[in-house]
Amino acid sequence: MANDTKPMDQIIDLTRELPSRIKPLLELLLGNLVFIGEIPAPTFHEQKRIKFLVQRFTECGLQNCSIDEKGNGAAILPGETGEKTILVAAHADTPFDSTVNHSFSISSQYVAGPGAGDNSLGLAVLATLPTIMARLNLRLQSNLFLLGTTSSLEKGNQEGIRFFLANKKTEIAAGIALEGILLGRLGFRSMATMGGEIICRFNTLNEKDSGAIDLLNQIIHQLRKRIRQQFNDATLVLGAVDGGASYKTPARSARLRFLVRSENDDTIEQTMEQINQIVAAVQHDSSSKIRFDVIVRNRAGGLEIDDPFIVQTKRIMKALGILPLEINHSTNTSSFMEQGIPALCLGLTTGENLNYPDERVAIAPITTGGAQLIGLLFAIDGGCCGQY
């Protein structure tokens, strides 16, 4: 392929050819997926997985292979001119503890294992992308900055990518966040979100005490009521409740994990004030101690649907027969938005049982997901996505 950048029609033609050209390299990609997936990487404990990724970068001859203070693994694939830099990132952590059996299996249609789609495949594509580009003789004018990020999920609150972007020494023209599933995912806006945790504890239970779970139920009821009455633009998601030791005794402790989201940052701030008021009132009327902690906080914003970045991405998806999903929000873009960097999130294949130990990803669509990524890189590189 010639070194010059290409207008969009030529990029579309190239993109249509890519799935069949990538297919001979699929075995290499799947090997990286299994190697990466079998390394446990719960949030805050991704070191071994990042070390493997950087080793792959080094083997590919990339520049500036390194691990920063937050454990992010980075490398640069130099462009022909290097006039701008495109960032491709994938989070390394998964929602599975290291005690979970991380053995992966491959069948004719699927790769299965804990975290296969979230986000071992994203990291495997990141690790394999330099080899794919080299084998297919694909060269960008722009530098390609590859980044495996840490501390993304739950209490991590995207700490790794936020640290990198806040301390970057290179100007980033645009960013792409990779998620293993779902193909068709096109996230370019971030909702205002607050992920919270409420923990209720009794030192001792008196006869009149109804227990920690009952108090959480009171809090949930009040929170639902206030959101319904005061914030019609907010949504409450009850993620998990756990606590207690037996069916026959009131629980001495219990925990609620939940999410509130809205298009409006002020709504989230006001909701947090309401939660503090509810918690204080319930605690006052009991002998318990109740603590409310904010675990995740993201601001609203992102790109508009008619932004050239999104328009051209949809052209690429259409050329590959990918139907964009209706949901266009992604927390992966919020950290980019905070730094004024245009970014979107792409899914790479289809899959099942997300965030369960028997999670699995479909093999065949991966070549299409990879073609989508490469096509978009050339569109950004060629100046087809507006000012990026």
Each PLM stretch: what is its role?
Residues 34, 38, 73, 237-244, ...:
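A short beta-alpha structural unit
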Residues 241, 322-383, 388:
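Zn-dependent metallopeptidase/amidohydrolase metal-coordination segment
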